[in-house]
Amino acid sequence: YGDAKGRPAAYSENNVPITPRKVLNVSTSGIHDGDYAMVIGFPGRTNRYMSSQAVREKEHVTNPVVIKARRDRLDIMLRHMEADPDVRLMYSDKYFNISNYADYAKWENICLRRYDVIGIRAAEEARLAAWIDADPARRAEYGDLLANLKKGYEARAEAVREKCYYQETWIRPSDVMMTANRLGTLVDRMQRDGIASVQDGDKNFAGVKSNTRRMMKDFDLATDKEVLTRMMESFIDNVPREMWGEQLPQLYDRFKGNVPALVDYAFENTCCTSYEKLCAWFAQPRTAEEILSDPMAAMANSVSSRRFAEKLKQAEETSGIDADKEELRYTHAIYEMRESEGTPQYPDANSTMRLTYGTVGPVSPLSLIHISEPTR
C-alpha cells in the first residue's frame, strides 16, 4: 500500500494498493524439460582464477577442518535443540548459519573430486607453461611461476591447517569463549595504552558490555559448555603445544589433560558465562592482572592469532615464497593466456548481482543416480 499517487508511505487509512507499471507473469503450468529458466541473485564470492595448488589447499587442507569442526558443533546443538523448545528457538539462526557453510564446504569438496577440478586446472597449467615458454618476455616474467606456486603452497600447508583449526575450534564456536576473547583484547589495549584499570561505565569496557548483552540474548549455558569442551579437545588434538601460549598448557597440565574437568572449572570460575556476572565482576575497577586471573580470559589471552600469523609468515620466509603473491601473478598470467586465445572471460562474482539462464533438463547428482523429472 502507498499514498494516492502510488508512492511508498507510512501507514494510513487513506493508503491505496500500489499498482506497478510492469509486472512479471508467473506461470502456473508447471515445469517441463526444455523450459527456459532464469536465476538472479547474489552469489557471495567466487574464485574462478584459482590455481590447482590453491584448489588443492582448499580441498585437502581447510575444507576438511571446516566440515569436521562444524559437524561436531551442529550435532551437539541439534541434540540440545531437540530436547528443549526454548533452546531450539534460541539456536535456530545459529544452527542455520553454521550449517550453511558446513554444507557448502562438504559439497564443494564432493564436486571438486567428482569433476576433478584439480586435474582440469593442472591441464590448463600445462598449456600455460607452454604459452609462457613460447615467448622470451613471458619466460622472464612468469618462468618461475608454477614451480613457485607448488613450493609455496606445500611449505605453508601445516601453518594454514593450524590457523583454520584456531578459527573453527577456538575463537568462533563458544559464546563464552568469544566474551573471554573480548576481555583478552581489552587486556592487550590496557597494556598497550598504559590503562591501569577498567570497570563498568568506562568507555574501554563499553564494547565488551554491549557485545555480550547482544550475544547472551540467545544463549544456553549447557549447550555452549558442551560445544566448547568438544572444540577444545579438537584444538588440543590437532594444534601443537607450542601454539597454545603460556596459560592454556598450565591449565591443561593442572587437570592432567582432562578437558571436560578443565572446562567445568573454567565455567565455574569465570565472569563470562552471563551478562549479569560480567557486569557484576566489573562493578569495581579491574587491572589487567586481575582480568587474566579469570580462567576463560587467561585461556583466550593465551592462544593468540598473532602466533598463527607468525607461523604462516615463517613458512613463507623459509621457503622464500609468498603463495598469495604468486597466486596473484598466476591470475594475471592465466588471464593473459586466455585473452590471447580469444577465450571469453568475466570477473569473479564478488558481492555483485549475477544472472544465470538456460533450459530445464535432467541431472545426475551422483554415480548411478539420474533425475529426469524436474522438481516442482
Region spans (language model):
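Short, structured beta-strand/loop micro-motifs enriched in basic residues and often containing a Trp
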Residues: 13-22, 355
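Short, well-ordered loop/turn sites that connect or cap secondary structure elements
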Residues: 30-31
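Short, surface-exposed secondary-structure boundary micro-motifs
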Residues: 41-43, 360
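Short, Lys/Arg- and Gly-enriched loop/turn segments at beta-strand edges
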Residues: 44-54
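Cationic-aromatic interfacial patches
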Residues: 58-283
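Residue-level detector of conserved catalytic or cofactor/ligand-binding positions
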Residues: 369-375
